[in-house]
C-alpha cells in the first residue's frame, strides 16, 4: 500500500493538473515548491523534531497547500515513521489554499490512487479553499 501511495504522490510532473499561464502567475503570485526542496525541508524537520513524524497524532497544517506536494510527503513520512494508516495520517493533516483548482488537485493527490469513501470525507473536511490569512482554521 505505501509503495503505491508513494508512487501516486511522487510520480507527477511538476505543477501538474492546474493551468498556470503567465497572467495567473502574475495575478496570484503562485510559487510551487519543487519535490527535491520539499524532501529537504521534511528531512530537516525529521532531524530536528522527530516526534512530528513518529507520533501520528501530531497535526500538520499547510496554509498555502497548493497541489499537495508538501502534505503528500508529510503523510508518507508519518506512515513510514509511526506505522499509522493512511486514514490516521490524513486525519491530522490539514491544508488551505486560495485557489479552488489547487485544492482539488491537493485532495486528489493526498487521497491516494484508490480513495475510499471514508478517506474522501476526511480530505474534504481537512483541505479547504479559503484565504490562509483570514481563515478561522476550524475545518468544520
Locate each region found by the language model:
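SAM-dependent methyltransferase catalytic region
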Residues: 1-140
Amino acid at each position: 500500500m505505501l509503495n503505491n501511495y508513494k508512487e501516486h504522490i511522487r510520480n507527477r510532473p511538476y505543477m501538474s493538473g492546474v493551468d498556470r499561464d503567465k497572467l495567473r502567475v502574475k495575478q496570484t503570485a503562485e510559487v510551487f515548491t519543487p519535490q527535491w526542496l520539499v524532501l529537504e525541508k521534511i528531512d530537516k524537520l525529521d532531524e530536528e523534531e522527530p516526534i512530528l513524524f513518529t507520533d501520528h497524532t501530531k497535526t500538520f497544517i499547510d496554509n498555502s497547500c497548493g497541489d499537495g506536494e508538501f502534505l503528500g510527503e508529510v503523510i508518507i513520512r508519518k506512515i513510514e515513521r509511526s506505522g499509522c494508516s493512511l486514514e490516521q495520517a490524513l486525519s491530522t493533516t490539514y491544508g488551505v489554499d486560495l485557489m479552488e483548482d489547487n485544492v482539488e488537485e491537493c485532495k486528489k493527490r493526498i487521497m491516494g490512487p484508490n480513495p475510499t469513501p471514508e478517506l474522501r470525507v476526511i480530505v474534504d473536511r481537512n483541505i479547504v479553499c479559503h484565504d490562509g490569512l483570514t481563515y478561522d482554521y476550524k475545518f468544520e
